[in-house]
Amino acid sequence: MSVRLKYRDMNHLIKKASVCLMALMILSVNVMAGGNATKSIKTSSMNWNPVMDAIIQVESEGNSKAVSGNSVGAMQITPILVKECNKILEKQKSKKRFSLNDRYSVDKSKEMFLLIQKYHNPENSIEKAIRSWNGGIKYSIRATNRYYKKVMSKMK
């Protein structure tokens, strides 16, 4: 009887340990995925840093206070893009939302860029990322050619 009880206790302990281990693994994945955008600039295996840095150089020469019409910040983000990011976050059941003032933050601007790429560019196409940043999701190749070449020339 006592051997059987010990076996049952051991099984119970193993099950509890397995559940705890799984919870820790899930928690660590969530922590890594939910970090600051500048620390986690990769979406899947794509490193968007060179693209974002080149876009920043073309859009504002690195000036986070740049203003041109409705576009502001280092990445020249429009209110429409902020709205699109918030729609994506809502669809993902996230409580996070971007404000219009977030456009002046380079880190928040990069977060918005990454969110747009993850949602609208899951194939991680650099060309699509650059052209759509300039011409919108339904960009025209002809209309975005000059911009695309400019950004590509700034990439390191």
PLM regions with names:
Residues C20-S28:
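Bacterial N-terminal signal peptides
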Residues V29-A33:
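Sec/Tat signal peptide C-region and signal peptidase I cleavage site
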Residues M1-S2, C20, S109:
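Solvent-exposed, charged interface segments at domain starts and junctions
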Residues Y7-C20:
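Bacterial N-terminal signal peptides that target proteins for export
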Residues G34-K156:
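Catalytic glycan-binding domains that act on GlcNAc-containing polysaccharides
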Residues M1-D9, I130:
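N-terminal amphipathic/basic-hydrophobic helices that include classical n-h-c signal peptides
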